[in-house]
Amino acid sequence: MSFQNSNSVLQLRLKSRAHSLVELVQTPNKSEYSELGFFRSPRQRLTSKAELPPLSVKPKANNCISKVKCSKKSYGMIKAFAVCTNQGLVRSYNEDRVTIIPRVKLNELEHRVSYFSLFDGHGGAGCADFLAENLHQNFFTNLKKETDITKSLKNSFSLAEKTFFTSQFKVNYDNSGSCALSCVIHAGNLYLANVGDSRALLGCRNRKCVYQLTTDHKPSNLREKNRIEKAGGKVIAGNGTGVSRIFPGKLSVTRAFGDFTAKIKSLGGNSEVLVAKPEIFIYPICAEYEYVLLASDGVFDVLENEEVNEIVWQVLDGPEKDMHEKAGNACKAVINLALKKSSSDNVTCIIVVLKDM
């Protein structure tokens, strides 16, 4: 995808709004949830049979309290899910966003679809906000036409990149960017679409194993480094403990939405270096799969996969009987451990429990 400069760009307006971190598209049962104080009318009705609980987290500036929300009931093979986010120890705002759609029945598909997405924004929250509001709409709209999960994920990512450019950069000069990690569960399969350095883990085999399901799109990834250099870009290694970065862009990720000054040729960019093309992973779900975890790089900058798995199981194996509360507490435990290890970034974690504990 190539981009053309829009007239003369005199300045770039970077957005850093502290919007709602968790965006759920919903057609909820109001009577069931209104007493929780979370109810909001949906922006758009995706289908006539959406089974979606309301869930939102609104951070306040300079508020380092971890925000946690969890499911209230099970959705087929999804026994529970939860999300926790924290702006971190250094940042005065949170650019992470989440969209969760627990289960939707589309007339075009035999099986219901569950959708979880994590967006790690940078340079302002504009791009992450845009993705949280639009990527799922692109996906479900395309899915009605294609009825193919993989194609719909790819098409939804491509359309989101194009529409963010035309509606935000060309109009508002919003040069913010965002990583994106989407997880779709459908017909016994787990689909992951990844752009950037957020990561998905799978816990399985009676707590004994944890597997990394996605690839981190970082300059240290040799395949990404080779791709960038072949496209005419450069990877500059950090000195000592410094972070390696790509040029043009001077970014520590090799794939991202937005960041159009790094992509527009007339502004010194290269559209083949920093790309928003997702890497797709497909896994058949088996009885040994126990949970899926999505987390932003602020978690994995300071924690190994095994540490995350261990802290998750310390909570899931605990005495609490309510699986939904367990999922929420597990998310919070991961975030708190990352903060204890002095993560300087925004930190967000989603856990989807696939097996009764």
For each predicted feature, which ranges?
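PP2C/PPM-type serine/threonine phosphatase catalytic domain
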Residues: 1-357
